[in-house]
């Protein structure tokens, strides 16, 4: 058969893998999982050993044909690193480390670096379980890194190995996660509360920022929010760009109803302290066991919900009731958590030239005035998590910590940032920031597909350069942003700066 020329074949009995299996094949102990396609046909489980630099995958596909899984890049599937396998009608299995030489054609690697751990087929599923090193010496193997990784999954209806667009899927995943939810405590008295907009008619405009005041859960004593997640209306996932919850002082007089966040009513724009949030591709996030968001005390602020809608198809008659779901408990954590927004001030002169292979924006935060701004002595802050944010031209971000003119560390980074995967991530270890430290945010953009200037702004086709640091203990500092020298920028552009 032609398959014998394409695959390395193994006798079924030599592998000790029965053809008939239960739904999931061999018992899986892999901690992480998600579907890779909109129809939930392809299900991936994975886990890894950081010390050994080995990662294991289990791909389960609703097919009796071949299955494949691997790593690809941002721009083309050609060159993708793909491990393929299946079970032939005679009971033999095939398994091979390959790469794409054309959009639909695979070629076997000279070095076989994937190890088969199990391959089964039943009346419904084909399940392939294998491991591979993070890195190999094979030029056709793409690395598994601590950045966002674009994975490719494909399958056939039979054992004829050829890729078809309708059965090939690419998804961005942060594979090397630091914490798994099973590692964290779940309080027995958990209460769920939804912070949501209600039956909001999304305007037919490209960009809308809708804000509304949110009454907090009514509790008689202090509680802690320990987890949050986006609550999206089905079919509106691609229209909701981000959801943020901001804090407003208890003395704030907040409007009722839903209004433009940055429009005529200044009350909304005065609420700038980010509490929790989610953006494109974001999922649930649980705080470390010793920190939580405080609610139920006289000092706790009022909240505003902000939803950014990107309706670039100008669809009429679309209603939305999206928001943020929070989980809270009376079991108090040791620390109240907070969020520090860093980056480049978006308005009015953040700009990126067209046709740029690489363009950098920098936002510098100097913390020596933090105690003065806080209005009280401020202890060192401990950073445990972060959220990266640019729009479509963003390619990479990082936050770097300096002390006394010396670089201490890169707090967080992603050299393969994807706008479609913006999620809160944990740091491998907590980072201490002292007053006087300098925090530099670096954003890398690419605009090869644009023929006009890209300006900073609220629309998805505008740009931003932001990193949100999750930290404790709580203080009164909400943001620390870099702001360019307007006179210098105007001079470089050959323009005259106005007041």
From Swiss-Prot:
- Comment on bound cofactor: Binds 2 copper ions per subunit.
Q: Do the record's keywords include Signal?
A: yes
SUPFAM superfamilies in the cross-refs: PHM/PNGase F (SSF49742)
Bridged cysteine pairs (disulfide): 211-261, 248-271, 365-480, 443-465
CDD domains in alphabetical order: DOMON_DOH
Q: Which UniProt keywords apply?
A: Copper, Disulfide bond, Glycoprotein, Metal-binding, Monooxygenase, Oxidoreductase, Signal
Q: Where is the active site?
A: 209, 389
* Glycosylated residue positions: 236, 250, 404, 476
* EC number(s) on file: 1.14.17.-
The DOMON domain is annotated at: 40-156
- Give one GO biological process term: dopamine catabolic process
Protein's UniProt keywords contain Signal: yes
Q: What PROSITE patterns does the record tag this protein with?
A: DOMON (PS50836)
Q: Which cofactor does it need?
A: Cu(2+)
Q: Which residues form the signal peptide?
A: 1-16
Q: Which GO terms describe its cellular component?
A: extracellular space; secretory granule membrane
UniProt enzyme class: oxidoreductase
- What does the sequence similarity comment in the record state about its family? Belongs to the copper type II ascorbate-dependent monooxygenase family.
Q: What is the name attached to this protein's record?
A: Putative DBH-like monooxygenase protein 2
Tell me which species this is from: Homo sapiens
């Amino acid at each position: 058969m032609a398959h014998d020329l394409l695959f390395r074949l193994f006798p079924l009995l030599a592998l000790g893998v029965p053809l008939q299996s239960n739904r999931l094949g061999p018992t899986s102990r892999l901690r992480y999982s998600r579907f890779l396609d909109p129809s939930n046909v392809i299900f991936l489980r994975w886990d890894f050993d950081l010390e050994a630099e080995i990662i294991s995958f289990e791909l389960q596909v609703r097919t009796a044909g071949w299955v494949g899984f691997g790593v690809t890049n941002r721009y083309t599937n050609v060159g993708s690193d793909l491990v393929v396998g299946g079970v032939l009608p005679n009971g033999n299995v095939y398994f091979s480390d390959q790469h794409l030489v054309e959009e639909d054609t695979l070629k076997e690697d000279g070095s076989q670096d994937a190890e088969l751990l199990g391959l089964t087929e039943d009346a419904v599923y084909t399940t392939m379980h294998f491991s591979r090193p993070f890195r190999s010496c094979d030029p056709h193997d793409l690395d598994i890194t601590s950045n966002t990784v674009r994975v490719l999954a494909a399958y056939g209806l039979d054992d004829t190995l050829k890729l078809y667009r309708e059965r090939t899927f690419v998804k961005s995943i942060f594979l090397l996660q630091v914490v798994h939810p099973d590692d964290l405590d779940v309080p027995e008295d958990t209460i769920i509360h939804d912070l949501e907009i209600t039956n909001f008619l999304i305007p037919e405009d490209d960009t809308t920022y809708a804000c509304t005041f949110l009454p907090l859960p009514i509790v008689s004593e202090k509680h802690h929010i320990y987890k949050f997640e986006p609550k999206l209306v089905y079919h509106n996932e691609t229209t909701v760009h981000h959801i943020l919850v901001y804090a407003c002082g208890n003395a704030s007089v907040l409007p009722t109803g839903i209004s433009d966040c940055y429009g005529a009513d200044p009350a909304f724009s005065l609420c700038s302290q980010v509490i929790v949030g989610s953006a494109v591709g974001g999922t649930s996030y649980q705080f470390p066991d010793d920190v939580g968001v405080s609610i139920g005390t006289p000092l706790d602020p009022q909240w505003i919900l902000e939803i950014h809608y990107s309706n670039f198809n100008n669809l009429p008659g679309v209603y939305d009731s999206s928001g943020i779901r929070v989980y809270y408990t009376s079991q108090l954590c040791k620390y109240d958590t907070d969020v520090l927004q860093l980056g480049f001030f978006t308005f009015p002169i953040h700009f990126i030239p067209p046709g740029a292979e690489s363009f950098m924006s920098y936002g510098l935060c100097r913390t020596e005035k933090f105690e003065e701004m806080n209005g009280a002595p401020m202890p060192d802050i401990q950073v445990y998590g972060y959220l990266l944010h640019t729009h479509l031209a963003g390619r990479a971000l990082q936050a770097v910590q300096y002390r006394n003119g010396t670089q201490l560390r890169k707090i967080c980074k992603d050299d393969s940032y994807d706008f479609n995967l913006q999620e809160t991530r944990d740091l491998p270890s907590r980072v201490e920031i002292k007053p006087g430290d300098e925090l530099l945010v670096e954003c890398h953009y690419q605009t090869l597909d644009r023929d006009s200037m890209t300006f900073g702004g609220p629309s998805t086709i505008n740009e931003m350069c932001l990193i949100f640091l999750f930290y404790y203990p709580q203080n009164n500092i909400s943001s620390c942003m870099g702001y360019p020298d307007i006179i210098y920028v105007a001079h470089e552009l050959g323009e005259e700066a106005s007041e």
